[in-house]
Amino acid sequence: MKVITCEIAWHNKEPVYSLDFQHGTDGKINRLASAGVDTAVRVWKVEKGPDGKAIVEFLSNLARHTKAVNVVRFSPSGEVLASGGDDAVILLWKLNDSKELEPLAFQDEDEAQLNKENWTVVKTLRGHLEDVYDICWTSDGNYMASASVDNTAIMWDVVKGQKVSILNEHKSYVQGITWDPLGQYIATLSCDRVLRVYNTQTKRVAFNVTKMPSESGAEGEARSYRMFHDDSMKSFFRRLSFTPDGSLLLTPAGCVESGENVTNTTYVFSRNNLKRPMGHLPCPGKATLAVRCCPVYFELRQALNKGEVSQKSSPALLNLPYRLVFAVASEDSVLFYDTEQSFPFGYVSNIHYHTLSDISWSSDGAFLAISSTDGYCSFVTFEKDELGIPLKEKPQIHVRTSVVTEKKVKKSQPNKVISPGSRLTEGTSLSTPTLQPKTPVAAAKDLPSTPVGIKNVPVSSSEERKISQPASQSTKVNQPRRITLNTLQAWSKTPRRVNLIPLKPDTPASVYTDTVPVPPSSEQEHERPLPSGDSLQNPPASKRPRTEEMPLSVSAEDQIGCKPNK
């Protein structure tokens, strides 16, 4: 494992908020999309050189947003790139094989000449009232969901370019969203400190997760504490994720209270029980803000010596016939985990001066890209089979049928957020992907809800959301209906007392007994100058639109090699 920071002004030295590798291209080319404060989306080509270092080549500058761009996500097939920003719109881009360039009204002529690829906007999705913070796709690429500062999440029919449903239960910014690979759930995470899991068929909340019992209260007194950080967390994003097989839901921005001690953590939920976490992954440093899973399935580890198993093995997160790898990014570090153990096997820190913002895996698992608000991006590179031996064939998973769209003619709904209707723009329509559902090897119900060796972390049942039943209508003629309004108190249950096993004070420190140290090259100083002030102690600079046109920092003729940290 090598850590290198590229000496590239990715977005004119402005903060970089998001990046994403393109998948589904059969390894022909590793395209990486990046976005940030300069309002542009840029596409790069990433290759591994003979010395193991990343070689980055500029491909295209996508200029259409009018304010900062907060998120970029390729569709599973890699054909479509979605971008969302502070201008409250989501743009869908496709690679145009023709030589016709994007209209110069949206792009500087000099910058357009540097483009080696031509990406054009095929649809514009309008529905949010404020900044778009996160985007996720369905497995077939026909639908997507977005999260926004307007306290809502929206489900979209990408083919039609229309809203399917508006999810408006959150009370504050929705900073992260993920769509279950099996198509059954959408999970959102907000700075209102609530994780909400929606059923994609009913468009209603299936689970609310917000508190868990605490043992710090006096005897006979039931107390609980919040599981997630509030809006004082120094990040704009809380990017949660399902594992590729849908067996686990991984949520950042967690916190665990044990007496007066508060530990930053990432919660792990089993698909069979999304009401409460099956465990958590402590982070001794800053709060965690993003989780991304490697798309490669690996074979299980083979024990070299039977005597080593009892001494060094740690409890597995889930008993699976394969091994999954994922990365957890905090404000200043990245930890690497797999599903065969609850301790991290790798740890990278002190690679950027400012807060990290996003991470992304390449399709072959050879790269993990890391973006930061200091304006730079880093790459963690892995040698062949360093993460494990890939499976020859990916396991087949059963994907549920597509979500049902809302009826066109519908009575007014006072609970819905009134927002501008979505409309289509320029031209080319998206083709419908032809991904067929696959037959599962093992049904999801066969997966254990609580693996051996992992302690359950109970959550108060008072936080389980109930959906109120509609009041019965009167059968009398010419008389108004009687409607019963249920208050929040009427929805709640009397909390039950559950004993929570307290964390030991040395829990965070003990996590790193098996971690892999950072390469010596990453411990040296960076060649670029250190910004004024300790930025890790301050939140990122406020977002702002570009006030003037800035020249592109890289030449189209150059292939820029990434130098290791010094």
UniProtKB/Swiss-Prot annotation:
One GO cellular component, as annotated: nucleus
Q: Where is this region: Disordered?
A: 411-481, 501-566
Species: Gallus gallus
Does the keyword section mention Transmembrane helix?
no
InterPro entries per the record? Answer: CAF1_p60_C (IPR029129), CAF1B_HIR1_beta-prop (IPR055410), Gprotein_B (IPR001632), PTHR15271 (IPR045145), WD40/YVTN_repeat-like_dom_sf (IPR015943), WD40_repeat_CS (IPR019775), WD40_repeat_dom_sf (IPR036322), WD40_rpt (IPR001680)
Q: Name one Pfam family in it.
A: CAF-1_p60_C
Recorded protein name is Chromatin assembly factor 1 subunit B
Q: Does the keyword Transferase apply?
A: no
* Polar residues bias locations: 425-437, 469-478
**What highest taxon heads this organism's lineage?**
Eukaryota
Q: What does this protein do?
A: Acts as a component of the histone chaperone complex chromatin assembly factor 1 (CAF-1), which assembles histone octamers onto DNA during replication and repair. CAF-1 performs the first step of the nucleosome assembly process, bringing newly synthesized histones H3 and H4 to replicating DNA; histones H2A/H2B can bind to this chromatin precursor subsequent to DNA replication to complete the histone octamer.
In this chain the WD repeats are located at 11-54, 64-103, 127-166, 169-208, 228-279, 351-392
Q: Which PANTHER family match?
A: CHROMATIN ASSEMBLY FACTOR 1 SUBUNIT B (PTHR15271:SF4)
> What family does this belong to?
Belongs to the WD repeat HIR1 family.
